[in-house]
Each structure stands twice: as C-alpha cells, then as structure tokens.
Amino acid sequence: MRPLTPRQAEILELIKRNIADTGMPPTRAEIATRLGFKSANAAEEHLKALAKKGCIEIMPGTSRGIRLPAEEEVVVEYGLPLIGQVAAGEPILAQEHVEQYYQVDPSMFHPTADFLLRVKGDSMKNIGILEGDLLAVHKVQQARNGQVVVARVDDDVTVKRFEKKGNLVYLYAENEDYSPIKVDLSCQSLTIEGLAVGVIRNGDWL
C-alpha cells in the first residue's frame, strides 16, 4: 500500500470522524474551512490523491460524494506514523516529527507496533537492521536487559541493545566497529522510547 502524507492522513481522519458523527461525509467546502485551505478546489486535489491511493471513492455530481471503501474503516486504524528528525525535548510522537503515515497493520508485529523509525547508519547490521530500513517500534518506557530499544540519550535518538547494571546503562551496537554507549544515570538523561519489534525493508514496502 502507498503511504499517506500527514495532510492526507488528516483529511482521511476528518472524513472518517464526520461520517461517524453525522452519518455523512463532509463537503469540499467544509474540509477547506476546517483544515484552513484557501478554497474548496485545494481540498479537491487532496481528495483526488486519496482516491488514487485507494483510500476513498469519489462519486461525481454531489457535494458529499465521498465514500470510504468497505475495508477502509479498518485500514485507517492501521496507519503507522513514520518518525523523522526528532527535536530536542519534544515527545517522539509529536505531530511535527511525523513524515508520513504507512497503512500497515500494527498487529503484524508482536508486540503491536506504535510507530516506524527510519534507520540511520549500520550499527545494528549484524541482526538485520540496515540503513534506510523502517524499524517498527512498540512504545514502552522500560526495557529488560538484552532487548533492542529505541533510546534517547541527552536528546540523541539511537537504536541499540539495552543492558542495565546498577546506575549504569550500556547500549550495545550489533556491529564490531562500534563501541558501547555508556550512560551514567546519576548525571545523564536516558529515555526509553520503545522496543524494536520488526523491520520493513526500505524499497520493498512502497
């Protein structure tokens, strides 16, 4: 399935909510007003893009001629955000960090995935996590020794194998070219953002 841009995902969610609340889809003018477009024509262009991706069906000749495919109510719930550059001090799932949404069933991973993170570098290549991959992440705040985590160390986000010994945390790469990252919790900040639960190989997904 093709990914949605954040704006497309926002419009799709608006359509879904409007149908749930009123029993009918919004008009183009209503979409434009609620999302700050300058005209209904701008909303129409986004609707055409959603239709091309199979997310909605457009019925000509009526102002409310928007329909969700029969399976779409399920698929919408399966949109996983792809997290891009993370700003210092901001929650990892803040809307401004979301590059786009991928329509993938989060339950295909165990535990269920909450977001995707694009892998940078080759520090985890020995366990099949390669640069450019999309790493599926289950959001948690604590980890057990030996688990592969997404961790934030003093606002730098990294993917490593976790090990805690007293007040020290070691983040191990799966590549002999990289030394462990040592974190002293008495004077450094470390946040567990989630557990790695799977990989989508870049290029195979789109």
UniProtKB/Swiss-Prot annotation:
It catalyses: Hydrolysis of Ala-|-Gly bond in repressor LexA. The keyword Transcription regulation applies. Its EC number is 3.4.21.88. It is an enzyme of class 3 (hydrolase). InterPro entries: LexA, LexA-like, LexA/Signal_pep-like_sf, LexA_DNA-bd_dom, LexA_repressor, Peptidase_S24_LexA, Peptidase_S24_S26A/B/C, WH-like_DNA-bd_sf. The active site is at residues 123, 160. Keywords: Autocatalytic cleavage, DNA damage, DNA repair, DNA replication, DNA-binding, Hydrolase, Repressor, SOS response, Transcription, Transcription regulation. Residues 28-48 bind DNA. It comes from the Bacteria. The record marks 88-89 as: Cleavage. One of its GO terms (biological process) is DNA replication. GO terms for molecular function: DNA binding; serine-type endopeptidase activity. Represses a number of genes involved in the response to DNA damage (SOS response), including recA and lexA. In the presence of single-stranded DNA, RecA interacts with LexA causing an autocatalytic cleavage which disrupts the DNA-binding part of LexA, leading to derepression of the SOS regulon and eventually DNA repair. Homodimer. Belongs to the peptidase S24 family. NCBIfam families: lexA (TIGR00498). This is LexA repressor. It comes from Shewanella sp. (strain W3-18-1).
